[in-house]
Amino acid sequence: MEQSKSASDKLAERKARLLDLHKKRQEARTDNHQEVVAEDARKKLPKNWEARKRQAEWLLADDKAREDAQAAGKDYERLKLLEVSAIDAERIEKKKKRKDNPDLGFSTYEAQTARQYSRLVKGMPARDMEKYEKQKAELGEAFYGGPHTTLHALTKDTPAAINKMVNDLDQQIERRKKYSRRRIYNDDADVDFINERNSKFNKKLDRFYGEHTAEIKQNLERGTAI
C-alpha cells in the first residue's frame, strides 16, 4: 500500500514538474514573440529616432522648467546660468560661435558657393516696400525684365551700395589669405625639384626612404658614387 502510494506521489510530482515546464515554455515563447515584434518596430523607425526622442523629451522638460520659472516670477535664463560652471559656459559659447559661423576654411567650391550665398542673403537689407513701389513706378515694364530689357541707363547704384560691395570684396580677400595653405618658399633650402608638384613628391620620398638613401645621396653629391 505504501509502495503504491509512493508511486502515485512520484507520478503527481512528475506531472506538476511537467506542467511547470510547460508554463515556462509558454512564457518564454510569448516573451520571444513580443521581443521580435518590438525589434521589428524599432527597425522600421528612422535611424535617428532615439536622438530625436531624447531631444523632444529635453525640450518638453525645458519648456516646463521655463513655465515654472515664469510662474514664480524668476528669470529662467539666469537660473540656467547659475547651474553651469565657468568652464562649461565658455565651452558652450565657443560651440555656439562655431555653429553660427562654421567657416573652417576651403573644402569644396560647391560648399564655398553655398556659404557665400547664405552670407549674402543674411546681409541683405530689410524689405523696403516704399522703395520697391517707387522703383517699380520709375522702371515701368522694364521692372520685370524681358529678353530685350536693358537696365544700364535706367538704374544707378547708391554710394552706400558701392561701399558695401567694396567692403565685402575686401573681407573675402582677407579670408582667402587667412585660409591659404600655400607654403612660403625658403631661399636657403637646397633646390632638388623642378616644380611644386615635384617638390611634394620628393618630400614624400624623403619621409619614407630618406634614412635608407642618405648615404647614396651624399655620394652622388660628392661625385664618389660607384
Swiss-Prot record:
Subcellular location: Nucleus
Record's GO cellular component terms: nucleus; Prp19 complex; U2-type catalytic step 1 spliceosome; U2-type catalytic step 2 spliceosome; U2-type post-mRNA release spliceosomal complex; U2-type prespliceosome
Coiled-coil zones: 9-29
Highest taxon listed in the record's lineage: Eukaryota
Signal peptide: none
Pfam families tied to this protein: SYF2
Chief localization: nucleus
Region named Disordered: 22-41
The keyword Coiled coil appears for this protein: yes
Family: Belongs to the SYF2 family.
UniProt protein name: Pre-mRNA-splicing factor Syf2
Organism for this UniProt entry: Drosophila pseudoobscura pseudoobscura (Fruit fly)
Organism phylogeny: Eukaryota, Metazoa, Ecdysozoa, Arthropoda, Hexapoda
Gene that encodes it: Syf2
